[in-house]
Amino acid sequence: MPNDKLVLVVDDDPDLVEAICMKLESKNYRVAKAYDGIEAWDKIQEERPDLIILDVMMPRKDGYKLCDELKNNPEYEDITVVLLTAVGSAVTSTRYTHQEGMSTLADDYIPKPVDLDKLMSMVDDFMG
């Protein structure tokens, strides 16, 4: 059954982006891809996603900055953001402190290496 929900996958690892997108497409989600925070912002302007899977550490603009920009913008604050992080053991909640000493407003996070089944379950829960 077709799904009109759009998920934007943002990571500087093209192989991971492809793997996540293939899994999402197998569950009939529409997908868009970006490889850094600046490209992601452009994609968000083109077509507003329902959910963003966002890597934390990327060139040009990192995931923390993009997440904070989205969550502090009334036009985009309701977009669900799931962070991908290699430092998941340091995360105790979604409003955790990152390197600059600021907290992030992400809706959830998943540690790397990514468990695709767990990520899909999280996406399904958020998409209702």
Features from the language model and the residues they span:
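Non-catalytic signal-transmission and effector/linker regions of two-component phosphorelay proteins
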Residues: 1-6, 117-128
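Charged docking surfaces used in two-component/phosphorelay signaling
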Residues: 18-26
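Short hydrophobic/Thr-rich beta-strand motif most characteristic of the beta2 strand and flanking loop
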Residues: 28-35, 43
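Acidic catalytic/metal-coordinating carboxylates
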Residues: 35-39, 62-68
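Active-site beta3 strand of CheY-like receiver
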Residues: 47-53
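Active-site residues of response regulator receiver
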Residues: 55, 85
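Receiver (REC) domain active-site loop signature in two-component systems and cognate sites
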Residues: 58
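Alpha4 helix (beta4-alpha4-beta5 surface) of REC/receiver domains from two-component response regulators
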Residues: 65, 88-110, 117, 121
